[in-house]
């Protein structure tokens, strides 16, 4: 069974504002501030997606939330990746909220099924706590999730096939 997850990118000023006013920070409370709601169908648990996000954020230390959102989608895209207007439109177990801007970047992980925050750490703290011996994407070397995906398609264009009249079963 897939551990579905969704990643939101929010400007850090909203984290600071909610913290200062002692308001709960949940995916629901951050919905209107999110630059992207990226759903991934597989491996949403902290030991995988938490580490993937932490590694990616260390390799892409941008502060502008719009730029982070765009690059995140580009680098994490694979066949089971979808974008939604609202994080509540799709059933998923974990929501990751990436807070970027002035100050340290933070990753908040929220378990939708238990309605609880799992953690709110810097990328390095996520790596320290959840890193395991897995084959993570090497974002620091310029790799992306789509680079690692095995796909029967090499482009969106139909493949041109030449049929040999003498041997119609040979499509070389």
Region annotations inferred by a language model:
Residues 13-31, 165-172:
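Polar low-complexity intrinsically disordered regions
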Residues 4-9:
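Short beta-strand scaffold segments in enzyme catalytic cores
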Residues 10-15, 32, 100-103:
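Short acidic-glycine loop/turn motifs at beta-strand connectors
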Residues 45, 49, 119-122:
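Non-membrane alpha-helical secondary structure
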Residues 19-48, 113-114:
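Short, solvent-exposed aromatic-acidic interface loops
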Residues 54-171:
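Low-complexity intrinsically disordered segments
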